[in-house]
Amino acid sequence: MSKIKGNVKWFNESKGFGFITPEDGSKDVFVHFSAIQTNGFKTLAEGQRVEFEITNGAKGPSAANVIAL
């Protein structure tokens, strides 16, 4: 799987999900807190730059292996 870079569009900490806007201009990608690769509390900030992979889930594309840059 190839890594894609993008920016967090929004992330709801209480619900544990949000969306990432890929820098290549493609459609926003769903991100669940379980895909964030960090220790401790897994959250993302609006506008934060990230690197991730795209997987196809039951409800469409979603981010996997999300790493903050």
Swiss-Prot record:
**Single GO MF descriptor:** poly(A) binding
**Pfam families named in the record:** CSD (PF00313)
Annotated localization: Cytoplasm
| Domain of life of the source | Bacteria
Quick one: signal sequence residues?
none
Q: Where is the CSD domain?
A: 6-66
Sorted UniProt keywords:
Activator, Cytoplasm, DNA-binding, Transcription, Transcription regulation
CC per GO annotation: cytosol
Q: Which InterPro entries match?
A: Cold_shock_CspA, Cold_shock_domain, CSD, CSD_CS, CSP_DNA-bd, NA-bd_OB-fold
Annotated GO biological processes are: negative regulation of termination of DNA-templated transcription; regulation of gene expression; transcription antitermination
Where does the UniProt entry say this protein principally localizes? Answer: cytoplasm
Name of the protein this chain belongs to: Cold shock-like protein CspE
UniProt lineage: Bacteria, Pseudomonadati, Pseudomonadota, Gammaproteobacteria, Enterobacterales
Q: Which gene encodes it?
A: cspE
